[in-house]
Amino acid sequence: MSGTVTKGQRNSFIAGIVLFVIGLGSHAWFPALLGVGLIVGAVVAHYAATQKAEALDQPWPWPADFRAAAEGMARPIDPTPKRLLPPDDKTKLVSHVATTPEELATLVADKPPAWPWALFTSVLVQRRNGVAARLRAVASGYQPRTRGPQYDGRGYAGLAQHAIGTFSDLAGQLNGFMLSPAFKGAFGDVDKESTADAEAIKDIANRLMDYHESFLRQAETVLQMPVRSDVLVFVADMGAFALCPLVGYDQFIATMCQRVGEAQDLLPYSDDTVWLDDATLNMDAPDGLMEAVGAQFKRFLN
């Protein structure tokens, strides 16, 4: 492939990603969500000046931290927290993350200290681990080969463009959900657990994971459409892009498990409300991924 960049190529478009951040307040517990959208702009000249044309035939190189996070998707999330202190009898009096429906029912019935956040986290863990095999498949970059019709580059670009639009729509819907009075209201007063509503907490946790299911379906669509061999790198780069929300969910759920563990360590020895660090749900696209995806759009829509 020639590395020459024509005037027409310089005037072509590159896709970008718009990041929408919603903060998680330490008391309101609003997860921070990054949505994604598509930006069209004439920025190919800068890309062409810094990248060789041959790079389009190689998948975007995953940074070590992003790869490690994606590797974690191949395994179930272990809710057992890393302990600050050796466990003792007092620790057992504080809520733990429930990994089975029976444990969840017991948690709701007994309502030990920190039960609202343990209940919320338990639903997330059970729903997430219930789709572990599917997450493992998308993290592996599984691309089935078929004997039927296959998408060419232009056809797959249209599908990818639609998928990015769907990601953006999901982000907007999730934005509204996270900011709704019902989300915060389910947990009641920050310093009065008796005002929390167990059914409401289960409902919002399940709805949060319904969005996770939607992101997962989009990742499967992006990765598993049959394409011609010259489009496989485009699929790989779009697959990395589609993993960003799923990686963000995994990290958020793991952090929530850690916060429950910190409550187990601290609550038995505190006479007042314990304030823990924020937990955030971030879906940032790693550096360079935006340019790689945009270059593939340019390549096939030129």
Identify the meaning behind each predicted range:
Residues 46-171, 175:
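N-terminal topogenic membrane-targeting module
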Residues 166, 170-293:
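Soluble C-terminal extramembrane regulatory/interaction domains of multi-pass membrane proteins
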Residues 31-42:
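Hydrophobic core segments of alpha-helical transmembrane domains in multi-pass membrane proteins
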Residues 62-64, 299-302:
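Acidic, glycine/proline-rich intrinsically disordered low-complexity segments
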Residues 5-7, 23, 56:
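Terminal single-pass membrane anchor helices
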Residues 18-28:
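Hydrophobic alpha-helical transmembrane segments
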Residues 1-15:
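Juxtamembrane interface helix immediately N-terminal to a transmembrane segment
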